């Protein structure tokens, strides 16, 4: 580890009050805790977020689908960096930050020797499925099964919306099959987890795997992943695993609060704004744990209330028709990725397809947006009430920050008073010395006689 990197990590962990916007995240965590092997300090919640985030990396042609020795995280990170440098291909979501993270992982005694096995990546437009998963052999007697969240593909986003009216989407079905396959291939206790849709898949797999596999799952991590329909969270299967599900959301969560949850949330402080708090790099860490808050923001509650009210008013058949109609319009661009939709030629294709939409589908889409608007308006009174309450009673971290500022002001006053007293004593001593010297000079002639 470079001294500059260590210094940066130390500054963030010890708290640089001059730069309150700089707080430690998963990068700093790797720099700060990376010298502690998992055998010495067992896997923690922050490790689980990091491994879940790494499932977004494009391991294609780097990690195989077999459950043999696999490839070390150090070697995988090196290859990812080489391919990115050579071909300018994307990594996970933020190339600049991802490169820093991968470089730190390569030097980390905690992570570099973790083995990657069983990598699968599947995008099927016909089945409207986007699914990817990888298993990490931790080297301390357990395996971490990580499910990837939504990627940049249009079909991946479509599958997310399908969750609002489907009892089971293809990725959830494959998550169950994958977890059971891991259990047969590896004779180790299991931890399953994921970020965003990956967290939903992890929870779903924990619910619906066979009894033998479920018995080996120690913990299920859901990092800001959406919930389920009411039938699923009321099911017997959910009750068999709910005590092992650990759900984490940022204070202004808008993704993790979607659909219905029955398990409690752990609220993590994020320095992101609004929906950008979904980015794992914005989650704040102190030492070996997240900085936790006691309450979500009014914006998060407003989004939660709005979406739930909208789903209750918009029946499943209408949801399907509206979502299928919008997807058909977007698919007219022939763009595979969401970013492709913003290219000029593709935008024109989308607009043309929207104009050609049949009357029934157009009515369903317009009704969906009308109900969404009315749901938002219906949630305004509650939002205003929560906002007023949050102004009257600040969140704990804000209170701590203001207390720290108050303490700093008091300390500054004490120091100023102490300096003033010291200065006054110094002036007094100087005055006394000068008076003594003057008196000595006056007496000098008399002594000479």
Predicted segments with their positions:
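Alpha/beta hydrolase fold serine-hydrolase catalytic domain that processes acyl esters and thioesters
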Residues: 2-3, 10-46, 51-65, 70-133, ...
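Gly/Ala-rich beta-loop-alpha elbow adjacent to hydrolase catalytic centers
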Residues: 193-198, 202
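Intrinsic low-complexity repeat tracts in disordered regions, enriched in small/polar residues
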Residues: 414, 432-433
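Acidic, Ala/Val/Gly-enriched low-complexity intrinsically disordered segments
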Residues: 418, 436-437
